UniProtKB/Swiss-Prot annotation:
This is Ribonuclease P protein component. One of its GO terms (cellular component) is ribonuclease P complex. Belongs to the RnpA family. The keyword Hydrolase applies. It catalyses: Endonucleolytic cleavage of RNA, removing 5'-extranucleotides from tRNA precursor. It comes from the Bacteria. GO terms for biological process: tRNA 5'-leader removal. Pfam families: Ribonuclease_P (PF00825). One of its GO terms (molecular function) is tRNA binding. RNaseP catalyzes the removal of the 5'-leader sequence from pre-tRNA to produce the mature 5'-terminus. It can also cleave other RNA substrates such as 4.5S RNA. The protein component plays an auxiliary but essential role in vivo by binding to the 5'-leader sequence and broadening the substrate specificity of the ribozyme. Consists of a catalytic RNA component (M1 or rnpB) and a protein subunit. It comes from Erwinia tasmaniensis (strain DSM 17950 / CFBP 7177 / CIP 109463 / NCPPB 4357 / Et1/99). Transmembrane segments: none annotated.
Amino acid sequence: MVKLAFPRELRLLTPTHFTFVFQQPQRAGTPQITILGRLNALGHPRIGLTVAKKHVKRAHERNRIKRLTRESFRLRQHELPAMDFVIVAKKGIGELDNHALTEALEKLWRRHCRLARGS
């Protein structure tokens, strides 16, 4: 049975972790969301989220976006390459409903899997 937990080891926790990804990222994006990824040596993927107040004013909307993104990652974690991912929310992401956001994330996860295999 595959474990679908979301332990601390699967999160980017420090500014150093985020900076590592921002230095040489592989990008996959839509007009509302961008996923930056960089290969790591840990053998499993990790995720970090940035949802700025500038783009999503209300806290409950920012929390909804982060919750759906974490859930999408949690369900796909065993299919993803061993990369550190940073999800960057952009202007207009607040207008996406739950289904549209989930579909956009699935598309971007698939694109990152292809990018990792190609490199």
